[in-house]
Amino acid sequence: MLHRIPAFLRPRPFSGLPLSCGNRDVSVAVLPAAQSGAVRTENNIQRHFCTSRSICSKKVDQSVPANEISQKAAESQGRGKETLKKDLLDIIKDMKVDLSTANVKTPKPRGRKPSASLEATVDRLQKAPEDPPKKRNEFLSPELVAAASAVADSLPFDKQTTKSELLRQLQQHEEELRAQKDREKRRISFTHIISNMKIAKSPSGRASTRPQHQIQFDEDMDSSLKQEKPTDFRKRKYLFKGKRLSIFADKAFADEPPEPEASPSLWEIEFAKQLASVADQPFENGFEEMIQWTKEGKLWEFPVNNEAGLDDDGSEFHEHIFLDKYLEDFPKQGPIRLFMELVTCGLSKNPYLSVKQKVEHIEWFRNYFNEKRDILKENNIAFT
């Protein structure tokens, strides 16, 4: 409660010192400012009407003119309009609304009228072309429609208009999403079609430019040609099934003897041995050493054979032993006959020489005695 100011009380001059709440001098100190036409500021109101008994230490601001206060009020009102417009646009842009808000209705404030900016926004939204309800709600789920109606009921505007605008915004996003999906499907289907495309070929095929009288070989043997050929080129043409031209004689090719296989020369054998010696490595175990000794002839080959290493010339056993038939040209008696019998006896007991080598050995002695015939006559030795 403010105390009344008596008429006879002389007001004191205004001082810059703060005054406590409930003091009688407060009203008296304010009178000079009121008489001069100044308006109370927010600081003065806060200083005079306080609930605490402590002394306010804030400095008293100077009185503000009325035109500056009106400018501040206009700016605050403009900011309020912008914030309200921004809040409305944020509500419209939000698409995801919980279903729990569908049955909740916020009480509308009584006696509150929408501002001019909100009315202008609503009018602008009403003038926007609206889609038919069936087409608009075609792709929207009933949950989104119920959520949009709940949001429209919670706003202090026309319910149908707000609901239609929310559904239109949701429908726009849904159409953009479906258009993007359609583009992806179209791209996938196009690449799938291109990958499965095949070049169509005419069934007739290209005519062959090769003359008919020319011999045609089988061209399907080429492994690099893996593509399927038309039906006209699949027929194989063999060289020996056609009509004979009778150009070459058959006997000329049939009488040719087969070429004998040339045996490797001494130099080739020696070169192979050198290569083998270069590639030889030290033995890893005793078995490899025994194998090498067997190849060199130092060990018997298994299974053990008495004739191992001997060249079999196809001769029989008696041809190695009975060699008397090769002594017909030698004398029937005398020292030469005795010597040749000893030679044949030694050759028959030699298992390392072949029959051919034994015969050559006897022939060498025959030729030797024929060359020394003159010497034998001088010594009275008969060779015949």
UniProtKB/Swiss-Prot annotation:
Residue segments, region Disordered: 101-136
Main subcellular localisation: mitochondrion
Biased composition range(s): Basic and acidic residues: 121-136
Transit peptide, start-end: 1-54
Coiled-coil segments: none
Entry similarity comment: Belongs to the mitochondrion-specific ribosomal protein mS31 family.
Protein's UniProt name: Small ribosomal subunit protein mS31
